[in-house]
Amino acid sequence: MEIPYGAGSRITYQWLPLLLALLAVSLYGRFLFQHALNAPYHDDILDVINLILNVNDSAGLGSIAEAFFAQHNDHRTLASRLIYYVSYRIQGEINFKTLSFIANLALPILALFFFTQINDTRNRWLIFLPVVFMMFQLRTYGVTEWAMAAFAFFYVYVYGVAALFCLHTVTKLRFFAAVVFAFMSTYSIASGQAIWLIGLLCLLHQSYVMRQIPHYYSIAWGVITLLVLAVYRSELETPNTLLTLIKYALATPLKHTQYFLGMLGSAVSFEVLYIAQFVGVLLLIILLWQTIAHYRKGYSKVEYTCWFIVVSAATVALGRTPYSEIQYSQTSRYSFASILLVVCVWLMITNRYRIARSHLLIATAASATVCGASYWFYTPKFDVLMEERVAEFNRGNYHVFGQKPAHTNALVADAISKGIYTPPPRPLAIPATE
């Protein structure tokens, strides 16, 4: 039975969810503030410190552009580097606390995007509350305080979602904005290249199925896609070519499938692989069902976002499966895509179907349980990670995987001597969880 509307229900179903949402965001922010370290971690050294050193030592615009566009592992991180540099110029030095805070702003930005997509105005806050509980949990603990990784794994979706929002019911101005956002998504992390495929499908569907926009949008997007990806791959040195990765996938299809499904369902698995894979299958079934059912009726921005998340996760699985065990799909850095997919599938269902308030309350309770349990389950793992970071910092060691310690230590020492980075006094205390 539907719960009746009234003055009392307005407090219960509008103001109370708003207060609970603010509480969840505040707790996450407090946790972030308590544990923030102004100390570089792994890729921070090569992607942040090395960038500022190279830009400051550059002789002209050409070498500056080269520093911003330079390859980092299999990625190009221009979008993140622009923010690093602006932050550095404003503060006068690199501050990794500041960068971590800016990186985590991706969460409220995405949450606001999703809030605007809720159709049920009377139950809007009750529908939105599970979104907040899912997004502001501790599942991504491994990248929460790791500036470079947080920018890459969080903002690839900020830019990608913004691009899709612009392409939906596209105009010339929105098309231009979508190209810019898609470019930024691509230059956040390699998986952001998936936005060009989903963007093309979005335009083709609007043009040839719904007949809402001219065909030239699809053609223009396709041409720009080829140009951007050609530039991206120009002088890109990597053994992980697309052809090589496809050969790996064809050789071990079961492992790749298990890895991919594990990633998709990792948001609520608490690192139990078979639970993650089950949830991944369930999410895919729901998404496929809705996609087929509404092919002629049209898709919302949320549905296109779902497919961007799925395809970007597939590219990550394609690149990581050959070099790691299936259980590695439960690593915290790869869970953000799953969190967003759960959120978007939830919004898709609540927009398509009228959900009784009693069922919304059940979903709210379930998401609140996941959020609370994430702090209980992942805080000890987070504390171990922070202990290792502090111990490494206090020893004066700046380790980066695949790099000689003498090289990375020299980069940090050079940044310190030039006033680019000022480390906190040693010994640095381990941040305590209160």
Stretches found by the model and what they are:
Residues L250, L254-L264, T321-Y328:
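Membrane-interface interhelical loops and short amphipathic "cap" helices
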Residues S87-I90, T116, F136-W146, A230-N240, ...:
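Juxtamembrane "helix-exit" motif on the non-cytosolic side of transmembrane helices
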Residues P4-G8, T12-F128, V170-L173, S191, ...:
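Intrinsically disordered, polar/acidic, low-complexity terminal segments
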Residues A24, F128-M135, V180, G222-L226, ...:
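Transmembrane alpha-helix segments characteristic
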Residues I109, Y157-H168, W196-G199, G262, ...:
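Hydrophobic cores of alpha-helical transmembrane segments in multi-pass inner/ER membrane proteins
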Residues R174-C202:
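Membrane-interface alpha helices of multi-pass inner-membrane proteins
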Residues F181, A313-E392:
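Active-site/pore-lining binding-face segments in mid-to-C-terminal subdomains
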Residues D43, R122-V170, Y187-G192, I309-I349:
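Membrane-interface micro-motifs in multi-pass membrane enzymes
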